[in-house]
Amino acid sequence: MYPVDLHMHTVASTHAYSTLSDYIAQAKQKGIKLFAITDHGPDMEDAPHHWHFINMRIWPRVVDGVGILRGIEANIKNVDGEIDCSGKMFDSLDLIIAGFHEPVFAPHDKATNTQAMISTIASGNVHIISHPGNPKYEIDVKAVAEAAAKHQVALEINNSSFLHSRKGSEDNCRAVAAAVRDAGGWVALGSDSHTAFTMGEFEECLKILDAVDFPLERILNVSPRRLLNFLESRGMAPIAEFADL
């Protein structure tokens, strides 16, 4: 069990079923010290309004010893790497994940998908690329991993991709993990929970990492401090309330 989970959705994304309070309760039971709520960006049909993300600034930082990061799973919109997060949203958020979602950016050919993903990585606006192993979006894995390492952007291994969605992701995710290993980049593990009961579950992710001998020191979820150091290296101001996590 790793004490950090970086990808989960609440009832604000209406195809998910848990509240912030539900996640806090599960985190306490499971020994999760720090987690990020990352509801879908507003260009998705059932996503929250952009005011939802701006108003996350009112959330407490720590509840019952559990740290809460304010995040978003934004949508990659085009080959220029634009995402549906901007302006005051950035000011309120700690963690920006971005990925391909069919209602916003339909699958294209390998070159176009790769260009869109690398442009997003190079934009400086994103910390993590979500589920890059999605088989519906063929990419140049080596080029993406090298760009991610260069720009200090983590590539996600998404536990839900092996259980509930994006069927057939295993081979691609092994390739992603191996390419990140070779490029000296970062991997982020995400449960992609749409119900609090699955938060912190990374069993399938770890099978992927074990298969390619991925180094423990390049996994962001190993400790709250490792993740916070990564975010601070990308410009996030230190959060005093997290000092004792």
Curated annotation (Swiss-Prot):
Any single GO molecular-function term of the entry would be: phosphatase activity
Give the protein's cofactors: Zn(2+)
Q: Which domain of life is it from?
A: Bacteria
A Pfam family annotated for this chain is PHP
Q: Name one GO biological process term.
A: bacterial-type flagellum-dependent swarming motility
Q: Which residues bind Zn(2+) 2?
A: H15, H40, H194
**Where along this sequence does the record place binding of Zn(2+) 1?**
H7, H9, E73, D192
Hydrolase as UniProt keyword:
yes
Q: Where does Zn(2+) 3 bind?
A: E73, H101, H131
Top-level EC class as recorded in UniProt: hydrolase
Q: Which SMART domains match?
A: POLIIIAc
Q: Which SUPFAM superfamilies match?
A: PHP domain-like (SSF89550)
Query: What does the cofactor section's free text say about binding?
Result: Binds 3 Zn(2+) ions per subunit.
- EC no. given is 3.1.3.-
Listed under subunit, the entry gives: Homotrimer.
> Which family does the entry's similarity section mention?
Belongs to the PHP family.
Name recorded for this polypeptide: Probable phosphatase YcdX
Report the source organism: Shigella flexneri
- Whichever gene encodes this chain, its name is ycdX
